[in-house]
């Protein structure tokens, strides 16, 4: 089993020449490779895409076999991938998914990091995060709009819809956390983001997600204070450890206007640098003595959360951004760790109730013009959604494409299938140079059970019921998505989430149009269904308005 290969540089093909037998198999091939593009992945030489150890394939041997199999896959065959390893090809039918993926799934009693890490070391499992192992990661852009929507809503609730002259304090500039600085600036606030690894600060500077870098609190605060005084938002990455810097900032009397965190606290061994340790020591010891690393990291997380609670008690709006740090702190003895809320129940759930979530697409041509043309089509089809238009304008101006050009925008039930059909028609007419793939994050309204994140504090107490993502995956398979994935542990770590993903290809054919209409209606409809079942009036009204047939819910 080979997991480190510094000689490999993976980039997807572009243009219209196929190396697989159809666009339905060329698409997953290119998107797998795109996940490992050096401008996309965090550690591509180790197959790590983002989120600690979220991988695209189990090892390099498995990667090679997946590539070989996708190239020979027939139009009526389906490839099965088990935790990053291709295990079977079976005859199905042309409207069935070409790939079915299951990553990191464990029987609940054994769903712990300790057991998973043992399997991982033996080469029997792979952590897929959410979009790493499901081959639809598009770089940091993939989380920017969701983060932006959260920060905008925080501004609405706490500062009369105006974040000018305000600043956000956070930590973590990995593949997900790296979206925070740009999202904050887009929302009108300055951002100070703490990050312990210089390489991550450098990557966010290089890709335009971060404006400045600093090495001391004083240096960072001087930049923040100047930007707030001028009401010209900018972002600064501060090199350091959040468990050390947050308590010190509180002690000094520094008070941000908003506070959150996106360190990779979901993975105590690979995701969080213990206080007082160097990065080199951390990397060396997590291979040699992972239990000691986890113990030290968890103790540091408790310190981190206590500091967040101190800021909250001082009047700073504080929110958990879904990395499970509160749970770790509670397990470490911080009894009131959950005193500050998660971002979904606090700010995002009304969107989920309408099936609104992170719709995304990528241009297989590799040509940015294809994305700009689809941006214009979104505006044309949704002329009254001025908030979305503003987002698309900002995205074009501020977001650098990583790997294949792609776009993220939050739209919901009734709009997703219209956009998919329109994109398919653009391919058919030759307005786009090649097909597009349409997918989403697993963080969506009907595709995840995560009691400390997406399904925290559900009205009916059904936070931990994971039937819903299973039903979502089954329905997307039956509806004809091009590839479907079912994962465990994404975002919040082992034992705390189950979630599903789907991707569908718009290749300009009539067959694709039929699949797109089914999948892109049914997928968000499961989110409305799930929230209607939990008793949310917004979801119940949406279900009635859209004519959903929910016999055990609407009666």
Swiss-Prot record:
Originating gene: hutU
Protein name, entry field: Urocanate hydratase
Protein family membership: Belongs to the urocanase family.
InterPro entries attached to this UniProt entry: Urocanase (IPR055351), Urocanase-like (IPR023637), Urocanase_C (IPR035401), Urocanase_central_sf (IPR038364), Urocanase_CS (IPR023636), Urocanase_N (IPR035400), Urocanase_Rossmann-like (IPR035085), Urocanase_sf (IPR036190)
Annotated NAD(+) binding sites: 51-52, 129, 175-177, 195, 200, 241-242, 262-266, 272-273, 321, 491
Enzyme class: lyase
Cellular compartments annotated: Cytoplasm
Catalytic reaction annotation: 4-imidazolone-5-propanoate = trans-urocanate + H2O
GO molecular function: urocanate hydratase activity
Cytoplasm keyword on record: yes
Entry annotation: catalytic residues: 409
Cofactor or coenzyme needed: NAD(+)
Gene3D superfamilies noted in UniProt: Urocanase like domains, Urocanase superfamily
HAMAP family linked to this entry: HutU
Keywords: Cytoplasm, Histidine metabolism, Lyase, NAD
């Amino acid at each position: 089993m080979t997991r480190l290969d510094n000689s490999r540089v993976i980039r997807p093909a572009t243009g219209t020449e196929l190396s697989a037998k159809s666009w339905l198999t060329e698409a997953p091939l290119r998107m797998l490779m795109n996940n490992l593009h050096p401008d996309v992945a965090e550690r591509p030489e180790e197959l790590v895409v983002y989120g600690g150890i979220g991988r695209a394939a189990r090892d390099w041997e498995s990667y090679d076999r997946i590539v070989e199999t996708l190239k020979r896959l027939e139009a009526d065959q389906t490839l099965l991938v088990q935790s990053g390893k291709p295990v079977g090809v079976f005859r199905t039918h042309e409207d069935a998914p070409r790939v079915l993926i299951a990553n990191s799934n464990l029987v609940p009693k054994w769903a712990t990091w300790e057991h998973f890490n043992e399997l991982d070391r033996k080469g029997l499992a792979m952590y897929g995060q959410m979009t790493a192992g499901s081959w639809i990661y598009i770089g940091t852009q993939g989380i920017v709009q969701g983060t932006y929507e959260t920060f905008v809503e925080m501004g609405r609730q706490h500062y009369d819809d105006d974040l000018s002259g305000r600043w956000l304090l956070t930590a973590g500039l990995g593949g997900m956390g790296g979206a925070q600085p740009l999202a904050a600036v887009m929302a009108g606030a300055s951002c100070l983001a703490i990050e312990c690894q210089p390489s991550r600060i450098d990557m966010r500077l290089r890709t335009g997600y971060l404006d400045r870098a600093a090495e001391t609190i004083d240096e960072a605060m001087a930049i923040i204070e100047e930007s707030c005084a001028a009401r010209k938002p900018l972002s600064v990455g501060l090199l350091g450890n959040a468990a050390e810097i947050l308590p010190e900032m509180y002690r000094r009397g520094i008070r941000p206007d908003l506070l959150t965190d996106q360190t990779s606290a979901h993975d105590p061994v690979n995701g969080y640098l213990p206080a007082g340790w160097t990065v080199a020591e951390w990397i060396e010891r997590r291979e040699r003595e992972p239990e000691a690393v986890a113990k030290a990291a968890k103790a540091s997380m408790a310190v981190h959360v206590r500091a967040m609670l101190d800021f909250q008690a001082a009047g700073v709006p504080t929110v958990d951004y879904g990395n499970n740090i509160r749970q770790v702190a509670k397990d470490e003895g911080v009894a009131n760790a959950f005193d500050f809320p998660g971002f979904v129940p606090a700010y995002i759930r009304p969107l989920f109730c309408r099936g609104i979530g992170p719709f995304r697409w990528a241009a297989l041509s590799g040509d940015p013009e294809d994305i700009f043309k689809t941006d214009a089509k979104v505006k044309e089809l949704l002329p009254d959604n001025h908030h979305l238009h503003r987002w698309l304008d900002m995205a074009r101006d501020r977001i650098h494409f990583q790997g294949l050009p792609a776009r993220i925008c939050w739209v919901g039930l009734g709009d997703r299938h219209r956009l998919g059909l329109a994109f398919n028609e653009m391919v058919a007419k030759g307005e786009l140079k090649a097909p597009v793939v349409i997918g989403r994050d697993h963080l969506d309204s009907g595709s995840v059970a995560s009691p400390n994140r997406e399904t925290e504090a559900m009205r009916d107490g059904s936070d931990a019921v994971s039937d819903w993502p299973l039903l979502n995956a089954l329905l997307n398979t039956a509806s004809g998505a091009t590839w479907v994935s079912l994962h465990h542990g994404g975002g919040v770590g082992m034992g705390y989430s189950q979630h599903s993903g789907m991707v569908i290809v718009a290749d300009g054919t009539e067959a694709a149009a039929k699949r797109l209409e089914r999948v892109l209606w049914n997928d968000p409809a499961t989110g409305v269904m799930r929230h209607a079942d939990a008793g949310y009036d917004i979801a119940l009204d949406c279900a009635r308005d859209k004519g959903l047939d929910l016999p055990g819910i609407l009666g």
